[in-house]
A protein has these predicted regions:
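Carbohydrate-associated surface elements
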Residues: 47, 164, 184
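An aromatic- and histidine-rich active-site surface loop
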Residues: 95-128
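A structural motif in glycosyltransferase catalytic domains
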Residues: 27, 34, 213, 228-229
Length: 239
């Protein structure tokens, strides 16, 4: 018999469906797997006017946010009210695991100021690219970097998803230790009929008997799109 205590874990993320990105998918995978047989996981994420949380068989706690009407569909978390911090404390979590070093990590920082709960931060993406590209003034960029770094430094453990992400951590000023913790997302296995394949090919004018490469992700250079294009060009030149 396994006598180990099953933990109650907060899975913090700034993005969750209907907003879809890599972090959103990882947060779903964590919640599904933990709730299946490892313990209890509750997703902590900003409110979204298009949320359909009834579709999930685990608890999702939504906190106040500001909605940005954009193609990405992101909400900006606003975790500043004391009652929001008390809500997390009242849930009696054993661990706070943030997958976003911005609003939700700051939320967890405020909670820990009132009640000490172990925290883990997984650093997924290269925020310096987004800051440098989207934040218009140096003063605002400096504030964004300080905010990001303070949230990272506040965690008891910092995880990265690959060795390559460590360079980004160092660029934003983090000098502490880290753990490389690879992750992945389970995808359902489906059987697609020959008729369905033929229909899709006709719809998108895809010729038969040629290799098909599909990229799913944000159209931004640091996602290695240039590498993909160069590789495709090399294959074309080689016939």
């Amino acid at each position: 018999m396994n006598d180990k205590k099953k933990l109650k874990i907060a899975i913090g993320t700034d993005a969750f469906p209907p907003t879809t990105d890599g972090i959103s998918n990882v947060a779903q995978s964590y919640a599904q797997i933990i709730n299946k047989n490892l313990g209890e996981a509750v997703v902590v994420t900003p409110k979204n006017p298009n949320q359909l949380d009834y579709r999930y068989d685990y608890q999702i706690y939504r906190y106040k946010s500001w909605w940005l009407p954009s193609k990405e569909g992101y909400s900006i978390g606003w975790p500043f009210k004391d009652e929001l911090h008390q809500d997390i404390i009242n849930m009696n979590f054993d661990l706070l695991h943030s997958h976003a070093p911005l609003a939700t990590s700051y939320y967890f920082r405020r909670v820990v100021e009132k009640k000490k709960i172990p925290t883990v931060l997984t650093y997924h993406t290269k925020y310096e690219y987004d800051f440098d590209r989207r934040v218009p003034t140096k003063a605002a960029r400096d504030f964004a970097y300080r905010f990001l770094l303070n949230n990272i430094n506040a965690a008891d453990e910092v995880w990265v998803t690959s060795k390559g992400t460590v360079d980004s951590l160092r660029k934003v000023g983090y000098e502490g230790e880290y753990i490389v913790m690879p992750n992945g997302c389970d995808l359902p296995i489906t059987n697609v009929s020959d008729d369905d394949i033929a229909l899709i090919k006709r719809k998108h004018n895809i010729p038969n008997n040629i290799p098909l490469f599909i990229y799913t992700g944000r159209m931004i250079w640091y996602k290695n799109i240039e590498l993909i294009l160069d590789a495709c060009a090399m294959l074309k030149n080689e016939g």
